[in-house]
Curated annotation (Swiss-Prot):
GO terms for biological process: adenine catabolic process. Belongs to the metallo-dependent hydrolases superfamily. Adenine deaminase family. HAMAP family: Adenine_deamin (MF_01518). The keyword Metal-binding does not apply. Its cofactor is Mn(2+). SUPFAM superfamilies: Composite domain of metallo-dependent hydrolases, Metallo-dependent hydrolases. It holds the Pfam family Amidohydro_1. This is Adenine deaminase. Homodimer. It comes from Escherichia coli O157:H7. Its EC number is 3.5.4.2.
């Protein structure tokens, strides 16, 4: 928990204080009063009856003593339950393929009033210019969009080619920005544990802020050392005992339920009345189709209540107050005097049915957000421009030679998990002994002219066709999987032609593709249009076989070397447990 930075975010002038106190005392007129409402008590459990009184951006008072208080406007909640605005503790907005402006339009009406985002996807492609754009978007957003300064660009030095660096000097230039809450996920955990000075310099520079972690499956002395370095949280836990041990050692636990990594069922049993202040909810990576059809943090709260019997006040606590306290955002997370008036009115608290949202004391209208979207996006000056410095490819670029009787390494996918297993398969004249093995390749897209790095993939479920994408964590090179070199080349050439994007090929033809013109990561289409296009892509992909629920998001993590066990980067096959490159052929 980091309270040392609260002064940075809770800006309120003396004049605002005097106006707020006057309304609290009953000596002045409120801007809004919400009547006919019950407030969920996140501290004690139960409910508080009575109005919510708002002056400016802040709550002036709560309770029956304000029943007859005067207001410029009154909001009839019709018996709704009021809870604090939801907070996502860790996400990459780019992974939604929406701009920050469009993301706000899609998620704010669902009660997501605050996000803590790490824009390291666009920073890996465009460097500091990408971070600066996110900051501009955050400055003009109604949603509270806070930024963690990306710490590992690239994710792991010397393991991949990416588009830009983000030096400590550049990072420090953003440290005191009003939207910055700390240092984003420190993914090079072996480097931290071994005491690499370059990494410790980053931790020292941001130690007065919040230091985000990333340590999937870590335990023992290594976990102790990582926490001893000052790391405060982790969103990568996927096993119950792993999460429990991290909590025991004082680390805060971000329980993640994204579109590919789905850890809520495994970790939800940990949440209780005692440790809930140390537990938070996050999505990390969630696509627009799921946001439109299932929700965002609201979907996670709903599952905690309905599937895991988490008490109401505890479920909403981990979705708001716990995260606010952890990041030192003490003006957020509670419906109490002096707190920012980020309020979600629920017609059904158990089903998380959002009736109305207020942020910074103002009611939110979804149609107004949509109407403002184009102008706000233009005002933010998005970093347009082709970031694909790659010539078209041919089938021969993906040719691999195999020797009968030899054994070859296979990246083995676990559906709906980011980790993979490292298996092997023997090749014969009839092919591999495993019939689920297909091909995977990663092509750098930043003008280095490297030959494609090629490998084998099992368990993905691809029976025919090919999928290609420029969303490929964290360097965002071109990743392609396929059953034939010809279709792989066709898919890759389509995303090159689009200036970045996603593509499905089957029967020798492009079945569906989605251009992503901003950094090869984001679309400028509306959330609804983007969700429809994702739906078409998924439908086309399902014709290729029994793929993961979110095939493109799952595929995007097959090149991320900081998550075990076997991955493929633009420079070759990488052992994510030994943190070293390895060979396709098994020789030992």
């Amino acid at each position: 928990m980091n309270n040392s930075i609260n002064h940075k975010f809770h800006h309120i002038s003396r004049a605002e204080y005097q106006e707020l106190l006057a309304v609290s005392r009953g000596d002045a007129v409120a801007d809004y009063i919400i009547d006919n409402v019950s407030i969920l008590d996140l501290i004690n459990g139960g409910e508080i009856s009575g109005p919510i009184v708002i002056k400016g951006r802040y709550i002036a008072g709560v309770g029956a003593e304000y029943t007859d208080a005067p207001a410029l406007q009154r909001i009839d909640a019709h018996g709704a339950t009021a809870v604090p605005g939801f907070i996502d503790a860790h996400l990459h907005i780019e992974s939604s393929m929406m701009t920050p402006v469009t993301f706000e339009t899609a998620t704010l009406p669902r009660g997501l009033t605050t996000v803590i985002c790490d824009p390291h996807e666009i920073v890996n492609v465009m460097g500091e210019a990408g971070f600066a754009w996110f900051a501009r978007c955050a400055e003009q957003a109604r949603q509270n969009q806070y930024l963690q300064v990306s710490s590992c660009v690239p994710a792991l030095e010397g393991c991949d080619v990416n588009g830009a660096s983000f030096t400590l000097e550049q990072m420090l230039a953003w440290r005191d920005h009003p939207q910055v809450t700390g240092l984003a996920e420190m993914m090079d955990y072996p480097g931290v544990i071994s005491g690499q000075n370059a990494l410790l310099d980053k931790l020292d520079a941001f130690r007065h802020l919040t230091l985000d972690g990333h340590c999937p499956g870590l335990g023992g002395k290594e976990l102790n050392a990582y926490i001893a370095a000052g790391i405060e949280n982790c969103h990568e836990s996927y096993q119950l005992e792993e999460g429990r041990r991290k909590l025991q050692l004082g680390m805060s636990l971000m329980i993640r339920e994204g579109s590919a990594a789905r850890n809520l069922n495994a970790l939800a049993p940990l949440i209780n009345e005692f440790n809930s202040p140390q537990c938070m909810l996050c999505t990390d990576d969630r696509n627009p189709w799921e946001i439109a059809h299932e929700g965002h943090i609201d979907a996670l709260i709903r599952r905690l209540i309905e599937q895991h019997n988490v008490p109401l006040h505890v479920a909403y606590r981990v979705a708001s107050w716990s995260t606010a306290r952890h990041f030192g955002l003490n003006h957020l997370g509670l419906l109490a005097p002096g707190k920012q008036a980020d309020i979600v009115l629920l017609s059904d608290a158990r089903k998380v049915t959002v009736q109305q949202v207020l942020v910074k004391g103002e009611p939110i209208d979804a149609q107004t957000l949509q109407a403002e979207e184009s102008a706000k996006l233009a005002q933010s000056a998005p970093p347009y421009g082709n970031t694909i410095a790659r010539q078209p490819v041919s089938a021969s670029d993906f040719a691999l030679q195999f020797t009968p009787g030899k054994r070859y390494r296979v990246i083995d996918v676990i559906h709906n998990e980011l980790i993979t297993h490292s298996h092997s398969s023997v090749y014969s004249e009839n092919g591999f002994e495993r019939n689920d093995v297909c091909f995977i390749a990663v092509l750098e897209r930043y003008g280095q002219r490297l030959a494609p790095a090629c490998g084998l993939l099992g368990g993905f479920g691809l029976n025919e066709g090919a999928l290609a994408a420029t969303v490929s964590h964290d360097s965002h090179n071109i990743v392609v999987i396929g059953r034939s070199a010809e279709e792989m080349a066709l898919a890759v050439n389509q995303v090159i032609q689009d200036g970045g994007g996603l593509c499905v090929v089957r029967n020798g033809q492009v079945q569906s593709h989605l251009p992503l013109p901003i950094a090869g990561l984001m679309s400028t289409d509306t959330a609804q249009s983007l969700a429809e296009q994702i739906d078409a892509l998924k439908a086309a992909a399902r014709e290729c076989g029994p793929l993961p629920d979110e095939p493109f998001i799952q595929m995007a993590f097959l090149s991320l070397p900081v998550i075990p066990a076997l991955k493929l980067t633009s420079q070759g096959l990488f052992d994510g447990e030994k943190f070293a490159f390895t060979t396709l052929e098994v020789t030992e």
